[in-house]
Every structure is written in C-alpha cells, then in structure tokens.
Amino acid sequence: MSGVPTPPPPGEMSSGPVAESWCYTQVKVVKFSYMWTINNFSFCREEMGEVLKSSTFSSGPNDKMKWCLRVNPKGLDDESKDYLSLYLLLVSCPKSEVRAKFKFSLLNAKREETKAMESQRAYRFVQGKDWGFKKFIRRDFLLDEANGLLPDDKLTLFCEVSVVQDSVNISGQSNMNMLKVPECQLSDDLGNLWECSRFTDCSLYVGGQEFKAHKSILAARSPVFNAMFEHEMEESKKNRVDISDVEPEVFKEMMGFIYTGKAPNLEKMADSLLAAADKYALERLKVMCEEALCNSLSVENVADTLILADLHSAEQLKAQAIDFINRCSVLRQLGCKDGKNWNSNHATDIMETAGWKSMIQSHPHLVAEAFRALASAQCPHFGLPRKRLKQS
C-alpha cells in the first residue's frame, strides 16, 4: 500500500518556474496478489459455460473488500469454447463501486510466470461484477504436455490486483530560499562512541572479554539495563556487569544495535540474537530477528524455530512457523513436493525430521497447537456448475 503522500522535494520545486503556492496530489493504490492451484485439472467440468470459483481473498485481514477468481475450463460461450476463460470477481465491497487493474498469468513446471494478460485500464467494479478475458488461453495449448503448463495435472493461476483508493492532497507555500538540512548523523556518532570506547563508565564481561560502555545509553535503550543501574544493585555499585549466557560475538552485535539501531550481521545469528534481545527487552531487535527467521524457514529447521519462538514469546514467528507446517501438510496431501520451495524435486516430511521428533518429546503442547491450527484451516471451495455434467 502506498504511504502518506509527501510534497515534492526541494530539488523539483527549485528547477524551472516556482509558484508561490503548490498542491501535491497522491492517488493511493493498494496492490496485492493471489495464487490459485487447481488439482486434477483434467477432471474439471467439461461443458461450455460451466464455472469453477476460488476461495475469496483480499489485500489483508482488515480489508472488507473481498474478491475471487472465476474460471470456465471450456469457455464461456460458443465464441470461446476452445479457450479457458478467466475473470476477477468482486464478491463484496463496502463501497458502491471501486476501480481496479488486474493481471493474470500461469505458472509453468518451473514456477515461472507465463502467458500473462493484463487489463489495459482500471475497470469499474461493483459488487457481483467481474472483468477478465473470455479467451485467456487455448485449451489445446494448455493441455499439451510439451508446453509444461499442467505439471502433475495441476493448473496454477497467479493474479495481481491494483485497487485505486481515494486521492489525498497536500498543499503549501513555496520558500524561495530553501535550505538543505544535513542528514542526521546521530546513529553514526553514537556508533563511533561505542567503537572507540570514549568516555565509558561501566564494563561488561562476556565470555572472558571486556566491553566498555555508557550506563546512560544502556539504560535509555534497555529496560533491563535501566533497572540494573537505577537500583542499588551490585552492578550499579561496581560499574561492572558479568554476563554468562550470551556469546561474545552475539553480545557485540546486540550492543551495536543498542548504540546505532542497526544489526548488519543479524542474518548470521538471528536465533541467538533473538534470545539476547528477549532477555534485555529490545523489542525492535527481537522483531527484526523474527523477520529474518521467518524468511529462512525450511522443512529441516521449522520445528527448532517453533520451539525458539515459544521459549522467547516471539508470537509472530510462532504463528509463521505453525502456518509453514500446515501449508506443508496441505500441499503434501495435494501431491506437492515441498511446503516452501514448491518446485523442489524431493518430498521431505517435516514429521520425519529430528527436530520434530525431539519437539514431540520436549514440547508436546507445540505439536498440539500445530494440529489444532491445521484442523481449523479453511479449504478452497468450488462454485456450483451452471449445467449438470454428462455422465460417462
């Protein structure tokens, strides 16, 4: 989704004519995508005009505008009987109408987009109205195995939607003598203070290594350090903190984040850094670690990641790990190869990994949570046919 509109930068306003007042109009556009896989496509409805519908989808959980895809496997009418027809349908909408552009494509055996067709303009949708292509792709071309569009008899459709939202205006007065304000260097300055150990007033000992720091900065950034130095604790009296459950390289990365808000080596140590961030109540760093771990989920590590998320109350990571497990389970039932890398050539079962077997023994409640989520997951539904199928 496009963000809050900003006025034109000074460079644009100072080149060429400059007016005393100006207005900047931002047309907001919400973009989202949807993937629909139809298993055993060759068994789909064979009569012209018969329809198959996807489940409903939207741009996000808070979006009340619901869409679905509608496909006619053997065309919509006599003109398109040798084609597959594909449409985008507005199922429900809180507004009287909405304008949207769309793009359809097929995913081939290599999971690459092909045979893309895009609307040339933003069409006007009202509830129950659909737009699309009567002649999206010829059936004989689609069914030809040499073209690789139905791997394992699965048709995968990919749809990208761009919904036009309300426009926003920002206006103001021009300043003929604009000054360029230098970028803030606070992060770099504090980083240098940490790297050079200047004006430090406390020492932190981790794994036999000493790290000199500034109590005021530690207290300002971490509620845990704040409590440690604020009260008459041993660390506050001696200006010394002994830390035994964090590796030195992980601690150094955490301290760099405390001073600069950056963690350049986060990807290499996201699991250990998440534990340290949780211990010292560094919420932003914790979520950054969750994001990195979400992006690296795999069949082999998802069980260990789920345990880590549960141990450190990383709720977003926990939800993503459970969702990954469930998607793998559903896709395996449908005959897909691998839950995350759908184009993988090997069918690895999460439940056969050492991490999963260990989790059954040490954290059985997580196994129960994963299965409860799987049981409550919604499955795609098919639309009713317009005609009865011929019986063979």
From Swiss-Prot:
MATH domain span: 31-161
Keyword Nucleus: yes
GO molecular function, one term: ubiquitin protein ligase binding
Cell location: Nucleus
Lineage, uppermost ranks: Eukaryota, Metazoa, Chordata, Craniata, Vertebrata
Function in brief: Component of a cullin-RING-based BCR (BTB-CUL3-RBX1) E3 ubiquitin-protein ligase complex that mediates the ubiquitination and subsequent proteasomal degradation of target proteins, but with relatively low efficiency.
Protein family membership: Belongs to the Tdpoz family.
Biological processes per GO annotation: negative regulation of protein ubiquitination; proteasome-mediated ubiquitin-dependent protein catabolic process; protein ubiquitination; regulation of proteolysis
Protein name stated in the entry: Speckle-type POZ protein-like A
Subunit details: Homodimer. Heterodimer with SPOP. Component of cullin-RING-based BCR (BTB-CUL3-RBX1) E3 ubiquitin-protein ligase complexes containing homodimeric SPOPL or the heterodimer formed by SPOP and SPOPL.
Pathway(s) it belongs to: Protein modification; protein ubiquitination
Gene Ontology cellular-component annotations: Cul3-RING ubiquitin ligase complex; cytoplasm; nucleus
Keywords of the record: Nucleus, Ubl conjugation pathway
Top-level lineage group: Eukaryota
Domain BTB residue range list: 200-267
InterPro entries: BTB/POZ_dom, MATH/TRAF_dom, SKP1/BTB/POZ_sf, TRAF-like
Pfam families: BTB, MATH_2
